[in-house]
């Protein structure tokens, strides 16, 4: 991935703060990335949101998170929020959504949560 070689890292997470999220709120997710290799690791870390679409399928959107250089044994703590409030460029649908990390282009397993619809709010 553009000069970033695969790295020997252990990734704990992502973990979401709430498994049920009211529409218009934000989800908080955390993770820890640890360099388990013997050499320094150059990392580019993104997060991937799997959005529910109107037809029930999921579409992905990648967001930049950080670039870092970790010494052997060093950790990078991730603590981020992603908003689900109304915006003009995306429409949100209730149901299961997911967040995953992507380190040097390699995705982690995702953490899921349910976006709830409110009766008086357009979704």
Specify the residue positions occupied by each region the protein language model found:
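Short beta-strand and strand-turn-strand segments in soluble, beta-rich domains
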Residues: 9-13, 53-67
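Short acidic/polar inter-strand loop motif in beta-rich domains
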Residues: 86-88, 102-111
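Short glycine/proline/serine/threonine-rich loop/turn segments at secondary-structure transition edges
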Residues: 86-96
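Beta-strand-rich binding/interaction modules
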Residues: 26-34, 38-53
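A beta-strand/beta-hairpin structural motif
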Residues: 60-87, 115
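Short beta-strand elements
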Residues: 106-123
């Amino acid at each position: 991935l553009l000069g970033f070689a695969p790295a020997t890292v252990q990734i704990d997470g992502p973990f979401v703060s709430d498994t049920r999220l009211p529409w218009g709120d934000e989800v908080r997710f955390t993770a820890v990335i640890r360099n388990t290799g013997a050499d320094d690791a150059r990392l580019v870390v993104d997060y991937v949101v799997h959005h529910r679409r109107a037809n029930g399928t999921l579409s992905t959107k990648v967001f930049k998170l950080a670039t870092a250089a970790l010494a052997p044994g060093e950790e990078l703590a991730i603590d981020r929020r992603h908003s689900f409030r109304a915006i003009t460029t995306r429409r949100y649908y209730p149901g299961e959504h997911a967040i995953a990390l992507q380190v040097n282009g390699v995705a982690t397993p995702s953490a899921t949560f349910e976006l709830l619809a409110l009766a008086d709010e357009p979704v």
